[in-house]
Structure formats: C-alpha cells, structure tokens
C-alpha cells in the first residue's frame, strides 16, 4: 500500500495537464508537453546570467543574493521536469519552489527594504527564522494536501506584488523607476495567459494554438528576472558606503528599454 502511494506521485500524467497535453508526445515521444517544457529555458538561464554579471559584488559584499536566484533556476528545472512528465511530484515541486523563492527573497533582501519597520531591525534574525519556519510548515501541509499549494501561492504573491511596487517607487534610483510598472505589466499579461489556458482550452484547441501556458513561462520568467535586477540595484545602492562598485541598468538588444528587452546590470569599480 505504501509503495503504491509513493508510486502515485511519480506516475506519468498523475499531475495537472495543461492545454498543450492534447498534443502530448507528438514532438518527442518522451516529453508530454514540448512547448511548455522548452519555454522554461529562460527561467533557468537568466538568473545565472545575473549571478555571473554580479559575481564580484556577490563575492566581496553580499553573497546571500545568490540564493533566491539559484532557486529561480531550480524552479525552471522543476517546471521542465513537471511538463515533460506531468507527474504529481513534479507539479508540487514546481509550485512549492515558487513559494520558497518568495520566502528566501524576503529573507535575503529584507534588510534593504524600506517598508520593513526599523524598530524590528534588531530582531532581524528572529523575523527571518519565523518566515522560514512558517514556509516549511506550509510546504509540509502542501505535500499532505496538494490543493493547498494554489492557496499558498496566492497568499504569498499578492503582498509580494505590493512590496515590489512600493520598493521600486521609493528606491530613488532613476534606472529602476519604471521597473514596478514593467514587472506588474509582464506579470499581469502572464497570468491572463495562465488563466486563459486553463479556462478556455477548448477554444485554443479549436484554433490549433494551445500554447498560452508556454507564453506564460516566457513572460513570467522575464518578470522574475527583472525583479532580481531591481532588487540587486537596490541592494548595491543601499550598501554603497561599504563597497567600491557602481552599477547601472543596461538593455539588450538596443538601449531603449522596451518591455520585451532584457535589462542587465553593468557593474564597475568606482574610480579612485
């Protein structure tokens, strides 16, 4: 009985299938949802690009910034596994890693967040442990009742959006003034694709285009990456008295900073 229960988590198609699953295994015989699998590549790669560009700052000043970004890469890998197999374990790890990204992000960046009450700064370690313990308890409950995961994500993501908007607008850094609007626009369109794929699948199948969840991956991945760029800039600026670096946001391709361009941080040593 116990073995059967464990096997249920790893069985092909034991998790939620998306609209593309109507064409499952047609592109590759061992990949259930090909487009949904491949579009995780930016989620895997972009955080590693930011880590590489900030490697000197991470080494010299604040190495903790690496953890939430590695978690985003892990989420991309988990999502790749989930959409390739559609098993329940992959689905839960994919979704729970998003909860942990938000948690670890908060733990790492909370010292430079303006909304965090200064009177609690002396109890920062306690606050961090409380956040981690609560998330661990929620994660355990989600394994017992997987449907709780969607509720946990909703409860975590709404205040996260408020914090992103507040911190970006209060940062006083010209390079990231437009980032809250940029992030929320990408996130809003991404989630509209997420809901449309789930609720209107028959319509997309009629049109022969069941790929809205794949577009969700691309836009949500870019939004998540942009969040890390914004808060990396805030961290660098907030600690400017403790290091020798200056940072500026650049864009690829071009320099106009359109919503579909990739922002990145140009890090240089301050001239003596």
From Swiss-Prot:
GO terms for cellular component: Golgi membrane. Signal peptide: none annotated. It catalyses: an N-acyl-sphingoid base + H2O = a sphingoid base + a fatty acid; an N-acylsphing-4-enine + H2O = sphing-4-enine + a fatty acid; an N-acyl-15-methylhexadecasphing-4-enine + H2O = 15-methylhexadecasphing-4-enine + a fatty acid. InterPro entries: ACER. It is a multi-pass membrane protein. It comes from the Eukaryota. Zn(2+) binds at residues 83, 213, 217. The chain crosses the membrane at residues 34-54, 61-81, 96-116, 124-144, 148-168, 183-203, 214-234. GO terms for molecular function: metal ion binding; N-acylsphingosine amidohydrolase activity. It is an enzyme of class 3 (hydrolase). This is Alkaline ceramidase. The lineage of its organism: Eukaryota, Metazoa, Ecdysozoa, Nematoda, Chromadorea.
